[in-house]
Amino acid sequence: MFPEEPAENGAGFRTPLAGLDNVILTPHIGGSTEEAQEAIALDVGEKLARFWRHGTTATAVNFPQVDLPQVKEGLLRILHVHRNVPGVLGKMHTLLAKAGINIHAEFLQSDRDTSFVILDVDRFGDRALLDGLERMDETVRMRVAG
């Protein structure tokens, strides 16, 4: 959090943190006091950590909302964002079945254009399966949680 904001909309914002791989910069998020900024920063950080670890997007504004339990011990979680069109889940299920991978839990939430599916599976098989999910024409982004 920076105590001073750019002078106007569209004004350049420069910081040495901008190019670092382990830093996420957020826009102004509404704190008018240092205490409020600290509380908001902690809240945003916790939400980002929950998304990174578990795939939870419970309070998202412009993304399908999913509030997930922690992945059960021994299972692995795949997070897959794709265009909301017919047949995507069928393609994903076919790839997993051909690899002999069992789906233990599946969570799907969609909005008009975007779907977010979370799969808890018993294993990943080889890298070819993940590459296959990533290369699907409808895939926007795919990753393994954790």
Locate predicted features.
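Rossmann-like dinucleotide-binding domain for NAD(H)/NADP(H)
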Residues: 1-70, 116, 146
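A conserved regulatory-domain signal marking ACT and ACT-like small-molecule sensing domains
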Residues: 58-146
